[in-house]
Amino acid sequence: MINSLLTRLFGSRNERQLRQLNSIVAKINALETELQKLSDTALQAKTTEFKQSIQDGKSLDKLLPEAFAVCREASRRVLGMRHYDVQLIGGMVLHLGKIAEMRTGEGKTLVATLPVYLNALAGKGVHVVTVNDYLARRDAAHMGRLYNWLGLSVGVVYPGMPHSDKQAAYGADITYGTNNEFGFDYLRDNMALSKADRYQRGLHYAIVDEVDSILIDEARTPLIISGPADESQDLYIRVNRIIPHLTRQENEEAEGDYWVDEKGKQVHLSEVGMERAEELLHQAGILEEGDDSLYAAQNLSVVHHLNAALRAHALYQRDVDYIVRDGEVVIVDEFTGRTLAGRRWSDGLHQAIEAKEGVPVQRENQTLASITFQNLFRIYKKLSGMTGTADTEAYEFQSIYGLEVMVIPTNRPTVRKDYPDQVFLNRSSKFNAVLEDIKDCAQRGQPVLVGTTSIEISEMLSEHLRKARVKHEVLNAKQHEREATIVANAGLPGAVTIATNMAGRGTDIVLGGSLDTVLAELDPDATEEDRFRVKTAWNRRHEAVKAAGGLHIIGTERHESRRIDNQLRGRAGRQGDPGSSRFYLSLEDSLMRIFASEWVQKVMRLMGMKEGDVIEDRRVTRQIERAQRKVEAHNFDIRKNLLDYDDVNNEQRKVVYAQRDELLDAESIKENIDSIRHEVIDALVTRFVPEHSIDEQWDLPGLQATLQSEWGLHLPLIEMLKGREEVDAERIAFLVQDAVDKHCAEREASIGAETMRALEKHVMLTVLDQGWKEHLATMDYLRQGIHLRGYAQKQPKQEYKREAFELFSEMLEHVKREVIASLARVRIRSEEEMATLEEQERRQVDTLLRQSQFQHQEAGGYGAGDEAVSLQRQPAGQGAAIAQVIRDTPKVGRNDPCPCGSGKKYKHCHGLVT
């Protein structure tokens, strides 16, 4: 009550901030008349003037009014588009490192030019992040005309482009690309063997288009670069044959072999199911005779394959979650309906689905590098984003990314009509109503966009419309190539467009069809009269569609997130145009069945409803929205859970990547190598000659043999110590250190100091990369089973942190030993031989990256489903703390505390490796 009273008196925080920004808008507008008088050359010279001001110490904030005014005037001259006042506000919000919520059709692409231009003046690079390659190339080409005119360079990055071209694109003032490409290039750069092989020059400022799609929807899917692992594909096929012999239970208590947790996306074997599975596995010869338990240590691989096969059959549907094309299983993005060619689910799930569909099973992969979008985008020194729908996720943006959401007013009032949901008993009644609505719109000349949640439904609707002889277009993963054309025509009178889950997002649907598209199709020699005739015809179509009610949106199912529903609705009513929307639901829809059906069924029974009857009531809509909020909270918990685990990996990743950067930047690492060698020798001597021990406990022959076998150093220790009095462990360590130092000095003298320095760097990088790769595999195994610690009354996350730290420390100790042993064993005789070795290694990395898979990690890959259940049993408040938001990852100083959490200084802990 007090909050609402204060809001009425002083306005909301959003309103107060808008008032502050409006005062800056007035300053920008005051400069317009003066800038309009400038010649093109004088206006273009402003860019050089701004750059000089920045070098002289002037801040970007001080430059903002004039820079925005220059960008607006340049846009008017080059693109024929002048920024509205609300677009200036949107640009300021983006510059301030916030999220601008702007409705569809408000010109987000044009808004971005303002902060992009201003921040690119600093010369550190600006990344404009889009959801697909088509939008990246389109926006780079279109807006690139403006930036180039103003004297700034523009690049675009996409998969498969030549190395030198990609380096040039990242070297440009402004770089366009997808979130995946920026992420994978970051990981690739941290696998590079020299500075010259790296693409990026640091992550300074990013503007994320459709920020909710990238930072929320895709936050559960880490980016993974993986290479082939040594795993037999035959086992997937053999285990797959067993699944049809297992019986699915209706629920956890019912009879059968396994039950499906649709909320947690998990499949669980019952006690009976375990016995039945063991019996079938024995019959198939997969479990050997004498193996009395499926869960015996030697059978963990079989359990892994069985779980993957169960999930493939029970949770993943063809033409919903994936399609089969050209003998391959191709993932369908659940949020956009697009295919994700080249992406593979991990943890053996993709192979299990291949076995289920009877297509060739490809080898399982080993993780080489990975990062979540959450941690990738938190590396940027400044981050901002724009979307039509962010306010419903404002808490998540603030708590995870430290990003505040500001709602930007529309240029014209929204007049779209959002009708109440219509709820039916079953799907057939629902789709009959949908078809009638579509036919009614088509007859009246009103364009209609039908949003579906899967390819299967879109094709079913298409078949019904074809039989009814209703002309229509289908936009889903299978028609990706025609996407822009279909969207451009979706606003034509009577046009019917079926779109899978917001595919085509990023292109406005213009009432009457896209005028630009029609003009572009004109003959290059067309006269002004021809162009006028085309524009007149378009105006007639535009007015006819407005008179028919504008674009009508039909939703065939509620999505898990209200935001996705709002995105679909937001396609209508752009820039003050008329429009309408309605969702058609049934009790058989996934969301209704899992979360909302009981209450609605009760209402329907009380009302005596029969098949074909419909409920249209705001109370039902509110109940459904409550169900959606439940799912949103559940999905937030999963994303937060993923982040909690990945934050552990992220601290380790930062240490390893920081060390790689130091290695690549350093001219010489001789001091580091000497320090590591002495530490390794001390540990080796202590192993055979323990401190404070008597000589009877020493194993001098073992020490001598190890130095010979691992180091190639013949050191007759026993003879050297004969006749000496008061020999202790410290004296022996000194003798060994001295001998090894002389041995290394002799090797350096024989091949030359320069070659030795190059060899040290090469060996350190190679061994560190190999150790990190093996550590990632170990962490994967740890993560997959960590939820089981909950049964031992232990906190899985705390156990994961503890064991991850121990594993990381062991990995670094192993790296130290292996580096010194490798340097002792490698035989290099000349600089030419060293150069050949480096080139071979570089080619191997290039080949590995070409053969690698760029994957989406399966959402439950962090034990999320199991742990989410165990977290619900905790006392209130446990595990609820919000992680501190880290927006930047500065270089760790040698005297700073080590990021691993040991409490030691960095130089005495993990910094010692480099």
UniProtKB/Swiss-Prot annotation:
Major subcellular location class: membrane
Domain of life: Bacteria
Compartment(s) of residence: Cell inner membrane; Cytoplasm
The keyword tRNA-binding is assigned to this record: no
Keywords from the named record: ATP-binding, Cell inner membrane, Cell membrane, Cytoplasm, Membrane, Metal-binding, Nucleotide-binding, Protein transport, Translocase, Translocation, Transport, Zinc
Cofactor: how bound: May bind 1 zinc ion per subunit.
Pfam families: P-loop_SecA, SEC-C, SecA_DEAD, SecA_PP_bind, SecA_SW
Cofactor names: Zn(2+)
One GO cellular component term noted in the UniProt record for this chain: cytosol
EC number(s) from the headed UniProt entry: 7.4.2.8
Residues noted as binding Zn(2+) in the record, renumbered to the chain: 898, 900, 909-910
Recorded catalytic activity of this chain's protein: ATP + H2O + cellular proteinSide 1 = ADP + phosphate + cellular proteinSide 2
A single GO molecular function term of this UniProt record: protein-exporting ATPase activity
Keyword set includes Metal-binding: yes
Membrane-protein topology: Peripheral membrane protein
Gene Ontology BP, a term: protein import
Binding site for ATP: 87, 105-109, 508
Subunit structure, as described in the record: Monomer and homodimer. Part of the essential Sec protein translocation apparatus which comprises SecA, SecYEG and auxiliary proteins SecDF-YajC and YidC.
Its biological purpose: Part of the Sec protein translocase complex. Interacts with the SecYEG preprotein conducting channel. Has a central role in coupling the hydrolysis of ATP to the transfer of proteins into and across the cell membrane, serving both as a receptor for the preprotein-SecB complex and as an ATP-driven molecular motor driving the stepwise translocation of polypeptide chains across the membrane.
HAMAP family in alphabetical order: SecA
Family (UniProt): Belongs to the SecA family.
NCBIfam families (UniProt xref): PRK12904.1, secA
Name the UniProt record assigns to this protein: Protein translocase subunit SecA
